[in-house]
């Protein structure tokens, strides 16, 4: 545990007065320089907050709130606790810190292992991409031991470094679906956080009585929803422990945006997100040859940040 604490307390080599924010994105550094309030203080907050329950797969109303006892199914989330050991965590962060971090938006720093991509024009090039880092080989192999990840072959890894001193956060967003495939897989290191899910869809979300016996408790019976809330006012909080693996698929991947609010970064957090190819780049797809080239490079595990 001492090694993990030492990694978490490692000095940030990036001067605090420098940030990588552009456009509407801000962090504590540029907010202080501009003497302005951050965008989230000017934006309306979600009125109906639910907590994701990994045991049931439902989004549950918090205790001691007007939503207590109400819930709705929230499919597409898998949370694997203690995916790596504290010793593996400390070694991974040590190796990440041995390479330079680049400034990114909203107080983050990043390291990219993947092709150079222009998502707007749907173009990509290898541009020096030589594969995922060597220290991820064991992690990727271990992923294949879990149900739903047996055939997961990542072609891109993005490391993000969050710091409370920089006011790090990431705005609600959906990951691209032209290049990246069905599963988004993220490994959280150094500290816990909360991933906040929201959906900017019209209409209402129907609520039922919270299940007591797991996701199959309501099978065989018809439960009429007895309450509804506007979908755009709902936020689902997924508690993500340190050293856990979070997998988003289906509706959680394609319909609900994911974000990390500034208030949920209480200590340094490093996240490694792994992405697979979409069907367009797999056998039978119109860009299968390029996809094969990307996979061969990625799974050589000889890469450095690009």
Specify the residue positions occupied by each region the protein language model found.
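Non-heme Fe(II) oxygenase metal-center motifs and adjacent flexible, charged/small-residue loops
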Residues: 1-306
